Amino acid sequence: YTNAITLLKDEKNLLPLICSKTYYYLPLEEAPFQTFVENLNFGTTINLISKEEISQIPENSTVIVGFHKDNSTAYKPYKISQNSKDILTELSKKQNVILDVFGSPYALKDIDIASISTILVSYENNDLSMKASAKALLGKTKISGKLPVIVNENLKAGTGIEK
């Protein structure tokens, strides 16, 4: 999983996470996320928040948003709900957002990514990918993955930033 993690954007140089900083984590969609938060907390301070607590985040904070899709079978839908898209749009107006997609990169197909400064694809929502993604965000492992598919005209196969 470590080699697969793909960094698509990091415009504000938010990665790797800084151990002395405090970050906020907002899990969206339906699948488990706890392993990711636990592993991020090994290297920095993470405040887990719910959708209802978004307004309490100080402006210009860094918020990690995880799209946790159930991908236990290929027949599960990869699309992100409109509610999650709306939350992401609102967050990116006042916060520095790191979006991590734990599922198909096609989830990004109809999301406006222009205002999101950092985007990663971790491909699967399981304990191994969550641990690998946390290590990558903390700078403990190199990020070198490339998109294996064409998502849309802006996200083509082979896209990926090494960090």
Label every PLM stretch briefly:
Residues 1-163:
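Preference for extracellular/luminal or secreted protein segments
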